[in-house]
Amino acid sequence: MGLEAARELECAALGTLLRDPREAERTLLLDCRPFLAFCRRHVRAARPVPWNALLRRRARGPPAAVLACLLPDRALRTRLVRGELARAVVLDEGSASVAELRPDSPAHVLLAALLHETRAGPTAVYFLRGGFDGFQGCCPDLCSEAPAPALPPTGDKTSRSDSRAPVYDQGGPVEILPYLFLGSCSHSSDLQGLQACGITAVLNVSASCPNHFEGLFRYKSIPVEDNQMVEISAWFQEAIGFIDWVKNSGGRVLVHCQAGISRSATICLAYLMQSRRVRLDEAFDFVKQRRGVISPNFSFMGQLLQFETQVLCH
């Protein structure tokens, strides 16, 4: 199906819609940029669209199957197909018009699937002229802020900024996602630092680190050692379920092990891979940019590669 029926929407017009609560509720905004770009900054109302080599191959399938891959939320797809949404708006990095889109680009593929699946209903399908770059310049107040680097907590515990402390204990926990933080056992023992980050739950990925504040935070323990014999992948779904539970309850979770290098980093990588449907190398680069010391052991990396196959082929 061609894209002749796709309308084009100006950035200022989208801003007007998103500032109206009623119209914002009836607008589905889909961001086709790479995952790392989305996480750095995005329109607050937007949903990321997964895209990888496997999805590129599946994009040659029936429109309904393509839409299921690019919009995994079944309830949202149902609302869309039933015509309960007034409009679906697709955006990329900065394309000025639909005519500029390559046929194999995620924005082109998604627009085609949306047009086909909504053809009998009232939902209008739009492409945002100028993409995120244009919208960010026009309506910066409707975009998320780039994550700030973690700062050493102030107060009595000065060891976090002490150059004598191990590098993995310096600074504070780092924000991976707005509700997901990664750090070390030392970070998990700093009450002031946890409160400064808004932490409400702690996922302890170790067999030896204590849970310091059980009366203040919700804890979950994954009692594994950091060695080549451990099957950490057996814990992936339980850990992912806990993180999602914290997210859905409006909280924030710190994932830590002893040093915040191998075990807890592995759990965060698995979470990103499944929740965002991205490859291991993409998730690794994303986390590495935020916590440069991460280094899952060789066995954990192998298990993550196997998990990647499961996630992307699901």
UniProtKB/Swiss-Prot annotation:
Induction text: By mitogens.
Sequence ranges assigned to domain Tyrosine-protein phosphatase in this UniProt record: 172-313
Catalytic machinery residues: 257
- One GO cellular component term: nuclear membrane
Kindly give the Pfam families that the UniProt entry links to this protein.
Answer: DSPc, Rhodanese
Q: In which tissues is it expressed?
A: Expressed in hematopoietic tissues.
Could you tell me which InterPro entries the record lists for this protein? Dual-sp_phosphatase_cat-dom (IPR000340), MKP (IPR008343), Prot-tyrosine_phosphatase-like (IPR029021), Rhodanese-like_dom (IPR001763), Rhodanese-like_dom_sf (IPR036873), Tyr_Pase_AS (IPR016130), Tyr_Pase_cat (IPR003595), Tyr_Pase_dom (IPR000387)
GO function term, MF aspect, one:
mitogen-activated protein kinase binding
Top-level taxonomic group: Eukaryota
Which residues does the UniProt record annotate as the domain Rhodanese? 23-144
Q: Where in the cell is it found?
A: Nucleus
According to its UniProt record, this protein's enzyme class is hydrolase
What is the reaction catalyzed? O-phospho-L-tyrosyl-[protein] + H2O = L-tyrosyl-[protein] + phosphate; O-phospho-L-threonyl-[protein] + H2O = L-threonyl-[protein] + phosphate
GO BP of this protein: endoderm formation; negative regulation of MAPK cascade; protein dephosphorylation; signal transduction
Principal localisation:
nucleus
EC number(s) stated in the UniProt entry for this protein: 3.1.3.16, 3.1.3.48
Q: Mutating residue 257 to S: what's the consequence?
A: Loss of tyrosine phosphatase activity
Alphabetically ordered keywords of this record: Hydrolase, Nucleus, Protein phosphatase
Q: Which family does it belong to?
A: Belongs to the protein-tyrosine phosphatase family. Non-receptor class dual specificity subfamily.
- Biological role stated in the UniProt entry: Dephosphorylates both phosphorylated Thr and Tyr residues in MAPK1, and dephosphorylation of phosphotyrosine is slightly faster than that of phosphothreonine. Can dephosphorylate MAPK1.
Assembly and interactions? Interacts with MAPK14; this interaction does not lead to catalytic activation of DUSP2 and dephosphrylation of MAPK14.
**Protein name from the UniProt record:** Dual specificity protein phosphatase 2
- Identify the coding gene: DUSP2
